[in-house]
Amino acid sequence: ESIILDLGNKAEAVIMREDMLPRENFRPGDRVRGVLYKVNPESKTAQLFVTRAKPEMLIELFRIEVPEIGEEMLEIRGAARDPGSRAKIAVKSNDKRIDPVGACVGMRGARVQAITNELGGERVDIVLWDDNPAQYVINAMAPADVTSIIVDEDNHSMDIAVNADNLAQAIGRNGQNVRLATQLTGWTLNVMTTEQLNEKHQAEDIKVLNLFMDKLGLDEEFAQILVDEGFTSLEEVAYVPVSELTAIDGLEDEDLIEELQGRAKDAITAAAAAEEEALKKANIEDRLLNLEGMNRHIAFKLAEKQITTLEELAEQGVDDLADIEELTAEQAADFIMAARNICWFSEE
């Protein structure tokens, strides 16, 4: 379960099994490199915890092997690991004369190879950090080549398209490549083929087109203009600056725009009133409504699935909520775990 490390001067540290690399075994007398990540001051003698499996270990090894990092010419912006198997680390240069990836790789790969050897053969992808999130994700997906990418700021997710013959490499064995890229960048990444991405967004465009025709009373040609200009919701139409609408060919008439935005606002108000009425009829439990991160719209979507109490939410799986478009898989998991913590694990 764990081993004790003698640090000298009568000091000891603990390294738990989960903080070791897979298939890693130590014998008495072995020298072990690790990172101190936690101190438990409540024990009789302050207990020190060391890890070899957390991202901090990878980061510190790069600090040791790449002197430019210590000199602040290079900066580590993040790391993600599948310990003992594969990792990704993001770096940026604070000196335009230095190639951050080349500096981390080293002459003939010597620097990164030393780190790989220390971590039991763990293969490390060195990723060039970028302040443009889309470009950063493209870099993080290497060695896969991304053909196109669509960013969803609201859900903090991206749809990534690759050629069909590159899909397996992009996803990686057991999803490893996309999982590490997700952890590194902090974005939810949906990988698919170029054809699948086109089909998905064509379906979404048709859905928005029908929404505008139905709720705004527009003919198909007018609604298509809005879709082509990138409008995806009634809220965008209602509250976008008038100057952006007048810049669209065929929408130069401000009276027409005023009427269009008025219809959009009326439709939003009507939908909110209908949703509020449905919430009252659903008799949703206050504990569910008061869950951290919950809003009335998501609560309404849950009620449509006959989930009106915290206990009912706790019994769900992430897949059960997958058809709620407003929820990412991560958000669904957070809601479910929060409900379980309150219903199943609370001491009250």
Segments (PLM) and residue ranges:
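RNA-contacting regions in translation and RNA-metabolism proteins
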Residues: 1-348
